[in-house]
Amino acid sequence: MNAELTKKYKYWQWRTLIVLMVAYILYYFLRKNFSAALPAMEAELGITKLQLGIFLTLNGIIYGFSRFINGFIADRCSRRLLLAGGLVLSSVINFTIAFSTKLDGVFNLLDVEGKATMGLVYLIGSLWVINGYIHGMGFPPCASLMAHWIKPSELATKQSIWNSSHSIGAGIVIALCGWLLTKFGM
């Protein structure tokens, strides 16, 4: 490769890596916010630890299967579309969960004390399990795009840099959700 082409390649390589990091920070933000909201959901809606545990367990199982399934999908379709589509779908589900108590007038999801009925519990749980599948749409495109753009001799180093997105996303969500719950409540 000539110097001009090498310079362009490095530029796009780093740009791709940064975009993938931002995308995975957002995936982590959308995945870990539920954990940060658990105490508030338990206190304000009366959802039990057992119910929350079932949601989280099923979410984790579905997430594991989803990463496997979406690995095959990422090899056969647009990785960028899969990555972005998962972020959009997960955002929609997160907003639906966040505003699910506002659907009370339509679906009678809260009892007279303002606690969750089983309908609301099933709605939140089902949405979170579906979100588990959608979260599995994040890693396969990232891994595939990194392998496509980064030389094998540099891949481990660049993946180590990309892996910091997990910690950054988790840190941001805990800090932000903690502040939001303190400031605005559920």
Describe the function of each predicted region.
Residues 15-49:
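Extracytoplasmic
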Residues 88-117:
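C-terminal ends and interior cores of transmembrane alpha-helices
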Residues 162-186:
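Helix-loop-helix hairpin linking two adjacent transmembrane segments in secondary transporters
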